[in-house]
Amino acid sequence: MSASSERELYEAWVELLSWMREYAQAKGVRFEKEADFPDFIYRMERPYDLPTTIMTASLSDGLGEPFLLADVSPRHAKLKRIGLRLPRAHIHLHAHYEPGKGLVTGKIPLTKERFFALADRAREALAFA
C-alpha cells in the first residue's frame, strides 16, 4: 500500500469514527474507544503522525453491550483494511480504501447512510438476543 493510500485509509477511518459518534448521539447509544494503536501506546519520545489514536471502537447499548465493533489495521500490517463486526447478527465486513471511491465493502461504497442502516440492523439484532 502506498503512503498516500495508507494516509487516505486512516483519514477514512477518522471519518467512520465521526459517523459512529454521530450515530451514538442521534440514537442515544454509547460510542466507546476500545483500543489505541500499538505505535501510539509504545511511542516513547517518537512523534505520532496518524490522525487519531483510536484503533478499535464500538457502538454499545445502554448496558454497555456492543452491537457494532469497528477496527482499522495497524500501520505495520501489510494488507490494511477497516473491519466492521456485528456480533449478534454474525456479520463481519471488510472495507478498503479505493481512490475516487472512498471506502468500499467489496465493490459497494460504504456511505454514511449505509453505515447508519448497518448500525440499525446490528442494534435491532441485539434487542432480540
UniProtKB/Swiss-Prot annotation:
GO BP, sorted A to Z: iron-sulfur cluster assembly
Enzyme class: translocase
Localisation per UniProt entry: Cell membrane
Role this protein plays: NDH-1 shuttles electrons from NADH, via FMN and iron-sulfur (Fe-S) centers, to quinones in the respiratory chain. The immediate electron acceptor for the enzyme in this species is menaquinone. Couples the redox reaction to proton translocation (for every two electrons transferred, four hydrogen ions are translocated across the cytoplasmic membrane), and thus conserves the redox energy in a proton gradient required for the synthesis of ATP.
UniProt GO cellular component terms: plasma membrane
Gene3D superfamilies xrefs: NADH-quinone oxidoreductase, subunit 15
Superkingdom of the organism of origin: Bacteria
Annotated membrane topology: Peripheral membrane protein
Pfam annotation, one family: NADH_Oxid_Nqo15
Protein name according to UniProt: NADH-quinone oxidoreductase subunit 15
E.C. designation(s): 7.1.1.-
Lineage: Bacteria, Thermotogati, Deinococcota, Deinococci, Thermales
Entry comment, domain topic: Has a similar fold to the mitochondrial iron chaperone frataxin.
Reaction(s) the record says it catalyses: a quinone + NADH + 5 H(+)(in) = a quinol + NAD(+) + 4 H(+)(out)
Family named by the database record: Belongs to the complex I Nqo15 family.
Keywords, sorted A to Z: Cell membrane, Membrane, NAD, Quinone, Translocase
SUPFAM superfamilies in alphabetical order: Frataxin/Nqo15-like
Oligomer status and interactors: NDH-1 is composed of 15 different subunits, Nqo1 to Nqo15. The complex has a L-shaped structure, with the hydrophobic arm (subunits Nqo7, Nqo8 and Nqo10 to Nqo14) embedded in the membrane and the hydrophilic peripheral arm (subunits Nqo1 to Nqo6, Nqo9 and Nqo15) protruding into the bacterial cytoplasm. The hydrophilic domain contains all the redox centers. Nqo15 is bound to the side of the complex near the N-terminus of Nqo3, where it interacts with subunits Nqo3, Nqo2, Nqo1, Nqo9 and Nqo4.
GO molecular function: ferric iron binding; quinone binding
